[in-house]
Swiss-Prot record:
Any GO molecular function: DNA binding
UniProt protein name: Multiprotein-bridging factor 1
Disulfide-linked positions: none
Pfam families named among the record's database cross-references: HTH_3, MBF1
Species in which this protein is naturally found: Emericella nidulans (strain FGSC A4 / ATCC 38163 / CBS 112.46 / NRRL 194 / M139) (Aspergillus nidulans)
Length: 154
């Protein structure tokens, strides 16, 4: 084919030809049909959906992706025993003495959540932790866990 036979298009409206695009398959039957045709099939789980992509749940989605892609067992994040001991100690202290139910009511959460926090097995929830800090007047996050948030003046 010589230069006389080929067409060279110049201009802003010039586009390339059609390309094979990536398609999203919804449903098991379409997936099976693609596999029968011998097409390349890759599956990915979408963790963030809708408007939640830019919010705090994106971090959780990243963690789930990490867990999904790793071969070894990834241990879930917990508040730890230091926080658990601080909550238990403060709840039984004089002046702050209260049951788990009373603490749950004041923190606007359930008794089971309080029990998980006192066991040290709960996932760190900033809303619950800040409510507990306010009610118990101790620090549960940062470096000096268990110290009084606003100590009494001498």
């Amino acid at each position: 084919m010589s230069d006389w036979d080929s067409v060279t298009r110049i201009g802003s409206k010039n586009r390339g030809g059609p390309v094979v695009r990536e398609t999203v398959i919804k449903g098991k039957s379409a997936l099976n049909a693609a596999q029968r045709q011998g097409l390349v099939v890759g599956t990915e789980k979408k963790f963030a959906s809708g408007n939640s992509a830019g919010r705090a749940s994106a971090v959780e989605g990243q963690h789930l992706t990490k867990v999904d892609r790793s071969d070894d067992i990834v241990k879930p994040k917990t508040v730890g025993l230091q926080v658990a001991d601080a909550i238990k100690k403060r709840r039984t202290d004089e002046g702050y003495k209260m049951t788990q139910k009373e603490l749950a009511t004041k923190c606007n959460t359930t008794v089971t959540v309080i029990q998980d926090f006192e066991r040290g097995t709960a996932a760190p929830d900033q809303k619950v932790l800040s409510a507990m800090e306010r009610v118990l007047n101790i620090k549960l996050r940062g470096s000096d866990i268990g110290k009084e948030k606003f100590p009494k003046k001498k």
